[in-house]
Regions:
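A conserved ligand/cofactor-binding region detector
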Residues: 1-441
Length: 441
């Protein structure tokens, strides 16, 4: 643990317009009134702010009680909160990135170093868990000093590694995150991050952010991956079904697929001529995959908001004790030490899985299974980005395996599941590798 890197959660922006007296709640409250009025929300707002302050605030309370308080979540969507969060853990960022309708820009340990150290819960001070995290960081530093790339050295780092992120979301998804922290298995550091976010939002939008029970209804939210849940029976069964001799699959598995009637010429027109009407039709192709990957790669996959995902729980993954050894570590003087430290760290967490605070010592190398659904448009868009040679090597391998399946079962779509520059007609990267010079026939 390194001193001086304290968590800092800042609400840096929210939807408002001080010049026209729109506060953080007005876009939602006046927009809601506009659903029942012939006037526009802007005209309604002009009349609302002419009222006495007490009446104006009471009317906001009433409209929220009768709309979002009765399950009309679209009212909550008419808000926006942007946070800059420093020195939270990567366990927290995994949690924040689960809801699909939140957006994030996260510090990359592929390019930034882990100089901030790690978070240590009070109940782990002076325990073997603290010693293990010191060992993880010490090995990370030695590997970096010996020219092991940062993107590979980071695999040994624990989830309690400190990082930074910028997050933007609306009131509905902030409530979603808040509800998720109330479940069993969520570490206190994660809860602290989200609770600070909620309290800051309540300071500027107290009536909008009020818990009215119906606006905290789980069925009203787009379900998010639950990495920290106690169990995920469906994914456990899928892993078992596709296991061989009790060994879980080591490669991506295509679980199912479906399509609609679209001729190859129409798909070519959609992609190559950017025909958005036909691109929208491609969303009705469906591909579901079960993909094993390290937590390091899952950090990237979970931020791909156009993928529908459900992930195996960390607790389930700990039982298998499988982890990724990056190619740049294999065959080096560090390989054996890396493997032994992974086994000890994972074993320690597995044996104490009932202690939610111990989850943070789990290394990023731990393999979890991600249940991924993509549509035909994603087969071009997201697969194109993830198969680019500039993409991280592990997520690139996962994307290429998915692309190979798509080429087999839906060749009319799979033809375009190629690196993005080939589709764009030019490489968007700063240093082109030449792969995008290929042409689609």
């Amino acid at each position: 643990m390194i001193e001086g890197f304290e968590k800092k959660v800042e609400l840096v922006a929210w939807l408002q317009n001080p010049e026209k007296s729109w506060d953080a709640e007005d876009s939602a409250s006046c927009g809601a009134r506009g659903c029942f009025d012939e006037k526009s929300s802007a005209d309604i707002h002009e009349k609302e702010i002419e009222r006495l302050k007490e009446e104006y605030e009471l009317r906001k309370e009433n409209i929220f009680r009768e709309t979002s308080g009765r399950g009309h979540g679209a009212v909550l969507d008419q808000s926006a909160f942007a946070y800059s969060i420093d020195n939270l853990t990567r366990a927290s960022t995994l949690f924040l990135c689960a809801p699909q309708y939140a957006s994030h820009l996260q510090q990359s340990l592929r390019r930034a170093t882990a100089e901030r150290g790690f978070y240590l819960p009070k109940n782990l001070e002076g325990t073997c868990a603290e010693d293990l995290m010191h060992e993880q960081f010490e090995l990370y530093n030695r590997m970096q000093s010996s020219q092991i790339p940062s993107e590979d050295a980071r695999f040994i780092l624990p989830l309690y590694t400190k990082t930074a992120i910028q997050t933007k979301l609306d009131a509905r998804e902030l409530m979603h995150l808040h509800s998720m922290t109330m479940r069993e298995g969520v570490a206190s550091e994660i809860k602290d991050t989200v609770e600070q976010m909620v309290e800051l939002a309540r300071e500027v939008a107290p009536k909008l952010m009020k818990n009215r029970e119906t606006n905290y209804e789980v069925l009203a939210w787009m379900p998010a991956s639950q990495l920290f849940a106690s169990e995920n029976k469906t994914i456990e069964e899928l892993i078992n079904i596709h296991s061989t001799n009790w060994n879980a699959p080591e490669k991506v598995v295509l679980l199912n697929h479906a399509g609609i009637h679209m001729g190859s010429n129409i798909i070519k027109k959609a992609v190559m001529q950017r025909d958005e009407a036909e691109l929208a039709n491609m969303k009705h192709y469906h591909f579901s995959f079960l993909a094993p990957m390290s937590l390091a790669s899952f950090h990237q996959a979970t931020r791909q908001r156009t993928w529908d995902q459900s992930v195996e729980t960390i607790r389930g993954a700990l039982n298998r004790e499988k982890y990724v050894t990056p190619p740049n570590i294999k065959g080096t003087e560090f390989e054996q030490e890396y493997k032994e430290l992974n086994k000890r760290s994972i074993g320690y967490a597995r044996d104490r899985v009932g202690d939610k605070e111990v989850i943070g010592i789990v290394p990023h190398s731990l393999i979890v299974y991600d249940l991924i659904h993509i549509n035909g448009w994603n087969a071009v868009h997201s697969i194109g980005k993830r198969t680019c040679t500039e993409a991280q090597w592990e997520i690139r391998s996962v994307a290429r395996q998915m692309a190979d399946y798509i080429k087999k079962v839906a060749p009319e779509i799979g033809k375009y599941s190629v690196p993005q520059g080939i589709i764009f007609g030019k490489c968007p990267e700063k240093k082109p590798c030449g792969a995008c010079d290929k042409k689609i026939e």
